[in-house]
A protein has these predicted regions:
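Outer-membrane translocation/initiation segment of Type V secreted surface proteins
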Residues: 2, 24-30, 34, 47, ...
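Acidic Ser/Thr/Pro-rich low-complexity disordered segments
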Residues: 25, 99, 115-118, 263, ...
Length: 950
C-alpha cells in the first residue's frame, strides 16, 4: 500500500504543477529520508490488536477523547464525526500503536500526547479532511496531530484538514491540498512536503525544520520561525521568510517576502535562487547570497498576499525600517531594485536599480508613482558591476565603494555615488543633477558627465554634473563631457581632477555640430590630453577653466566644425584659462591642428595674460587688448589682436586638395610626351609602312608652388597602331592609341593617387624635303583618391573627372650623311573638367577647370649606325626650352577660401634616347630625360617601347 500511494498518487499530483522550462522546472516530489517502522504484516501479526471497534464504541458511548496504547492499531477506516456535540472527537495512539490507511474526516488523531511520548507510534497513509458540521453549524476540521516523538508517513491533507506537529515529532512525505494546513511547531521535522494549494506554517515559537518542500498551485509556506530548507516555490505560490529560509528556489510566477521576525539585523533568508519571472521582496531583515535571474526588491513598503499575487500598499508609505540584501548575484536578465534600505556586496551581471521613487507591485508588474518614498534612502554598497551589467541611481539613491568592472553605471538626477572605480572598459554616466563624492577612479574605462546650469538638487555644489574628485589613471581612461541642450548653459564641474588619460569635450556617441561644453575645475594635475571642439568662424567653442592651481603638462587636440573659416577671420580664440599655468603647461598635439583651411597653434598669453591660452593662426603669442587681467570663470574672454599682415599656415588637408588639383595636367603631359616620342621614332624610320606598338612609361615630378610641395610618380602603359599613306612628295602617317597611367602623390600632407584612362588619335606629315608636322588629339578619364593627414589621423575623398587636349609640333629633319638634326617648335593645350567634392572631415573642395598651355622649342640631333648584322641604331640627344603660360588654376575650400595654383614658368629639358630597327618586322626604342623649371622638376622621365610592322 505504501508503494502504491507514493509512486502513483504523488506523480499524478506533480503533473498538475505549473509547466516550466527544463532548466527552471519544479522538481518531482522528494523521497522521504525515513520509512515507517510499522510491520509489513501488521494486519495479520498476532502481536498487534485491531482496536477500531473499541474506539468506535467508546465514541458512541459519548466519550469524546481517549487513548489506545501498547501495540494497538486502526486500519482501513473512514473515521468520521459521530457526535456533532463533541467539541473534538479525538483518539490518541501511544506506545507502538499505529494508524494505517485511514481517513480522518472532521475528527482528530493524535500520535503521542503532551504528557507521554508516542513511543514508536506512527500514522501511515493518512488522509485528513473536514466535511462534517458540528453542533454550532461550523465545519469541523479533521486533524492529525503529532506530539512528542510521534511520526507520520505519506499524509494527504485536504480541504479543512490539518497536520499539526509539536515537540520532536516528524512527518515524511506530506501532501497539503487547497484548504489544508500543515503546522510545524516545537522542534519538529517535516521532510518531503508537497504544498499543493494548501499552507505550511512554521510556527512563531518553534525551532522546527521543514526540508525538501515543493509549494505549487497557489500554495503558501509561512516561516514565522524555525528553518525551511530546500523549498521550491512555484507559480502563484508564496513563501514568507520570517524565521530562516535556506536554499529556497523561486520559479516563474513565485513570490517570496523576507520579513524578519527577530529584527532588522537578523538573517531571514539565505542562498535563495530567484528564477526568471519570480520575485523576492525584502521588507525587513537580511537576505544573504541570493542568485537572482528574476527580480529582487528591497523596500520598506509593505503589502499582502491575496488571490495568488502580492499587492503593495497603494500609498507606498514606508512602514518598516531595516531591510538589506547581502552578497546577492544579479545574473543577466535579473533585476535588483532598491527602493529603501541597503544592498551590500552585490555582483551585478543584470540590472541594479537604486531608486527611492514611490511604486509597488500591481497585477504582477512594478508600477511607479510620482514622488519619493521618504524616510530611509536606497543605498548600494560594495557593488561590483560586471560586463553586461547596469547600476542605475535616481530619486535619492546612493551607491558607495562601487567597482564598475566592464559594466555600466548611470547616475541620474538626484542620484549620488561615492568612491567609484571603473576598470576593464567599465563606464559611468553622471547626468545633470547627479553627483559624486569621494574619488571617482577611472583605471580603464570611460566617465561621462552631462553639463547644465544650476540644478535644484546640486546647486550648492556647482553647475551641471558634479564630482568632488576624479582620477583618470592612464591612456585608456576617458572623461566625456555631454552637452545639455535643455539648459541655458552646459557646464560640468569637478573640484579636483587628476588627469593622465583623455578628456573629450563631447559625448561618447559623438557631438552635434554647434554644441559646446565648459569644464570647471578647481585644481588640475597630470599629463593627459584634452580633446576640444570649436567653431572659429562663429567665434564659439569649448572652454576649460581651472580656477585655483594647475600642475603638470597636458596635450590639447582641437576639432573645428566651421565650414566657412576665412583667412581674415582666422583670429585667436580663447580656449583655456588655467590659474598659475606656465609656458609648457599646455601644448598642441603634433604641434598644431588643422581647422578648415588653416593650421592653428596653441599659444600662451604674454606676461600680463599668462594664465590664458589661445588658438592662433600664428605660432607666436598674441597680444591681448590693453586692460585688466582676465578673471577666471564665466565672463567675457580676452580678445587678442594678432599682428596684421601675417599670412596663416595652410592645413594639411588644404595642401592636399591643392596638390590634387595639379595632378591631371602633369599626368596628361606625361602621356603626351611619350606619344610625341613615338612620332619622332616613326619619322626617323622613314621606310615604315604600318604596324602596332606598345610602351611602358615611368616619370617622377617634384612640384613646388606657393602653397604646396609634393612628389608625383607616374607609371603606365600605352598601346597603339598606325598606317603610312604615301602622297606626292610626302607621306602621311595616321594612328590611334589607348593608355592606362597611374600617378601616386606623396608629401608631408597626403598620399593620394590618380588613375588615368586615355584614348587618342595622332598623325605625322612628312615632306621629302625634311619638313614635318605632328598632331595629337587625346581624351582622358581620371579617378582620384586623396588621403590627407588630419589632426593625427587621415581624412579621405574620391572624385572622378574628365579632360582632354591637343598638341602640334612643326620641325625639319636635316640629314648630314650619317648624322641628323631636327629643330622644332611645339605647342600643347589641356583642359580638365571642373570638380567639386568633399573630404569625410567635412572640408568642401571646388577646383576650377585644370588648364595648361605650353610652348616648347628644341633641337634633336643624332647619328645613324648600321651594325654588321644589318641592325640600324639611331642614338640621339635632345635639348629644349619649355614655357607654361597658365597661371590661375584656382581651388576654393569651404566655399570661401580661394587659392591660386600657379605652375607657370620656363624650364629646361634634356634627354637621351635610342631607336633600333632589329629587322624588317621588329624595332624598339627607349628614352630618358630630365627637366628643371621654377615649379616643376622631373628628375627622370623614361620609356621603353617595341613595334611590330605588318
Amino acid at each position: 500500500m505504501k508503494r502504491v500511494f507514493y509512486h502513483v498518487f504523488f506523480p499524478a499530483l506533480c503533473l498538475t504543477a505549473y509547466p516550466l522550462t527544463a532548466a527552471e522546472m519544479l522538481p518531482t516530489p522528494y523521497l522521504p529520508v525515513q520509512t515507517t517502522t510499522m510491520p509489513d504484516d501488521l494486519l495479520s501479526n498476532s502481536d498487534y490488536t485491531n482496536h477500531w471497534d473499541w474506539v468506535k464504541e467508546t465514541w458512541e458511548k459519548g466519550y469524546s477523547t481517549f487513548s489506545i496504547k501498547d501495540k494497538k492499531y486502526i486500519a482501513n477506516q473512514e473515521i468520521t464525526l459521530i457526535n456533532p456535540a463533541f467539541s473534538k472527537q479525538v483518539v490518541t495512539l501511544l506506545n507502538e500503536s499505529y494508524s494505517y490507511n485511514n481517513t480522518l474526516n472532521s475528527v482528530q488523531l493524535n500520535i503521542g500526547d503532551g504528557i507521554y511520548d508516542a513511543a514508536g507510534s506512527e500514522a501511515v497513509n493518512t488522509t485528513v479532511k473536514g466535511e462534517y458540521t458540528n453542533s454550532k453549524g461550523n465545519i469541523e476540521t479533521g486533524v492529525l496531530q503529532l506530539n512528542g516523538d510521534g511520526k507520520a508517513f505519506h499524509t494527504l491533507v485536504e480541504n479543512n484538514g490539518a497536520l499539526t506537529m509539536n515537540g520532536d515529532s516528524q512527518a515524511y512525505d506530506t501532501v497539503v491540498k487547497a484548504g489544508g494546513r500543515q503546522t510545524v511547531g516545537g522542534r519538529a521535522y517535516a521532510q518531503a512536503n508537497l504544498i499543493d494549494g494548501g499552507i505550511q506554517v512554521l510556527s512563531v515559537t518553534s525551532t522546527a525544520l521543514a526540508e525538501d518542500t515543493i509549494v505549487q498551485n497557489g500554495g503558501q509556506q509561512i516561516i514565522y520561525n524555525g528553518t525551511a530548507k530546500n523549498s521550491h516555490i512555484g507559480a502563484n505560490s508564496y513563501q514568507l521568510a520570517s524565521g530562516l529560509a535556506l536554499d529556497t528556489y523561486l520559479y516563474n510566477g513565485a513570490f517570496q517576502q523576507v520579513f524578519s521576525g527577530k529584527g532588522e539585523e537578523f538573517v531571514a533568508d539565505r542562498n535563495t535562487t530567484v528564477y526568471a519571472g519570480a520575485r523576492q521582496t525584502i521588507t525587513s531583515g537580511i537576505s544573504e547570497n541570493a542568485q537572482v535571474y528574476g527580480t529582487q526588491v528591497i523596500t520598506g513598503v509593505d503589502g499582502q498576499w491575496s488571490d495568488g499575487d502580492w499587492v503593495s500598499d497603494s500609498n507606498s508609505n514606508v512602514r518598516v525600517n531595516g531591510q538589506q540584501a547581502k552578497d546577492a548575484t544579479i545574473h543577466a536578465g535579473g533585476l535588483q531594485r532598491i527602493q529603501t534600505g541597503n544592498a551590500d556586496g552585490t555582483q551585478v551581471y543584470g540590472t541594479q536599480l537604486v531608486n527611492g521613487q514611490k511604486g509597488g507591485w500591481v497585477g504582477g508588474s512594478w508600477v511607479e508613482q510620482s514622488g519619493w518614498t521618504g524616510g530611509i534612502r536606497a543605498n548600494a554598497t560594495n557593488t561590483t558591476v560586471h560586463a553586461g551589467g547596469l547600476q542605475q541611481l535616481a530619486w535619492y539613491g546612493e551607491a558607495s565603494n562601487t567597482v564598475i568592472d566592464g559594466g555600466r553605471q548611470e547616475v541620474l538626477a538626484l542620484g549620488h555615488i561615492s568612491n567609484t572605480t571603473l576598470r576593464n572598459g567599465g563606464s559611468s554616466l553622471i547626468a545633470y543633477g547627479g553627483y559624486s563624492t569621494g574619488t571617482l577612479t577611472v583605471e580603464d574605462g570611460s566617465l561621462t558627465m552631462e553639463g547644465g546650469s544650476v540644478h535644484d538638487w546640486t546647486g550648492n555644489l556647482g553647475k551641471g554634473a558634479w564630482a568632488a574628485s576624479a582620477d583618470l589613471q592612464g591612456p585608456s581612461s576617458v572623461l566625456y563631457l555631454k552637452h545639455n541642450a535643455d539648459t541655458a548653459e552646459s557646464v560640468t564641474t569637478i573640484k579636483a581632477l587628476t588627469h593622465n588619460g583623455v578628456v573629450n569635450f563631447s559625448a561618447p556617441e559623438g557631438r552635434d555640430a554647434g554644441q559646446f561644453n565648459r569644464l570647471e575645475l578647481t585644481t588640475l594635475e597630470g599629463t593627459g590630453t584634452f580633446v576640444m571642439n570649436t567653431n572659429l568662424s562663429g567665434g564659439i567653442g569649448d572652454f576649460l577653466n581651472v580656477s585655483d592651481a594647475v600642475t603638470g603638462q597636458f596635450k590639447v587636440t582641437v576639432h573645428d566644425s566651421g565650414s566657412e573659416l576665412r583667412s581674415r577671420a582666422a583670429t585667436p580664440y580663447h580656449l583655456i584659462y588655467a590659474n598659475g599655468s606656465g609656458a609648457d603647461t599646455f601644448a598642441m598635439t603634433n604641434g598644431s591642428v588643422d581647422l578648415g583651411a588653416y593650421k592653428y597653434y596653441l599659444v600662451h598669453g604674454a606676461d600680463s595674460d599668462k594664465d590664458n591660452w589661445y588658438l592662433s593662426p600664428q605660432a607666436n603669442t598674441p597680444e591681448p587688448e590693453p586692460g585688466p587681467d582676465p578673471e577666471p570663470g564665466p565672463g567675457p574672454s580676452p580678445e587678442p589682436n594678432p599682428e596684421p599682415g601675417v599670412k596663416p599656415d595652410l592645413s594639411e588637408s588644404a595642401k592636399a586638395v591643392i596638390a590634387m588639383a595639379n595632378v591631371t595636367p602633369t599626368l596628361w603631359d606625361a602621356e603626351l610626351s611619350t606619344l610625341r616620342t613615338r612620332l619622332g621614332e616613326i619619322r626617323q624610320m622613314r621606310d615604315y609602312e604600318e604596324g602596332a606598338w606598345g610602351k611602358y612609361i615611368s616619370s617622377r615630378y617634384r612640384v613646388s608652388t606657393e602653397h604646396v610641395a609634393y612628389r608625383q610618380d607616374v607609371n603606365g602603359v600605352m598601346l597603339g597602331g598606325d598606317k603610312r599613306f604615301d602622297l606626292e612628295n610626302s607621306a602621311l602617317i595616321m594612328g590611334s592609341m589607348a593608355s592606362y597611367t597611374r600617378a601616386d602623390l606623396d608629401s608631408s600632407s597626403t598620399n593620394g593617387k590618380a588613375d588615368s584612362y586615355g584614348i587618342g588619335l595622332y598623325t605625322t606629315w612628312l615632306h621629302n624635303s625634311g619638313y614635318y608636322i605632328d598632331g595629337v588629339l587625346k581624351a582622358n578619364y581620371f579617378r582620384t583618391e586623396n588621403n590627407p593627414y588630419f589632426n593625427g589621423g587621415r581624412t579621405h575623398a574620391k572624385d572622378n573627372t574628365v579632360g582632354g587636349g591637343a598638341s602640334v609640333e612643326i620641325g625639319k629633319h636635316i640629314a648630314l650623311e650619317t648624322w641628323f638634326v631636327e629643330p622644332y617648335l611645339q605647342a600643347s593645350w589641356f583642359i580638365g573638367d571642373q570638380t567639386h567634392y568633399e573630404l569625410d572631415s567635412g572640408m568642401s573642395v571646388k577646383a576650377d577647370a585644370a588648364r595648361s598651355l605650353k610652348g616648347e622649342t628644341g633641337l634633336t640631333f643624332g647619328k645613324n649606325v648600321t651594325l654588321v648584322d644589318g641592325t640600324l641604331l639611331q642614338p640621339y640627344a635632345r635639348v629644349a626650352v619649355r614655357h607654361e603660360f597658365m597661371k590661375n588654376n584656382d581651388v576654393v575650400i569651404n566655399h570661401t577660401e580661394k587659392f591660386k595654383n600657379d605652375l607657370s614658368g620656363t624650364s629646361g629639358k634634356y634627354g637621351l634616347g635610342m631607336t633600333a630597327k632589329l629587322n624588317d618586322r621588329w624595332s624598339a626604342w627607349g628614352e630618358v630625360s630630365y627637366e628643371k623649371g621654377q615649379h616643376i622638376e622631373t628628375p627622370y622621365s623614361g620609356q621603353l617601347g617595341i613595334r611590330y610592322s605588318f
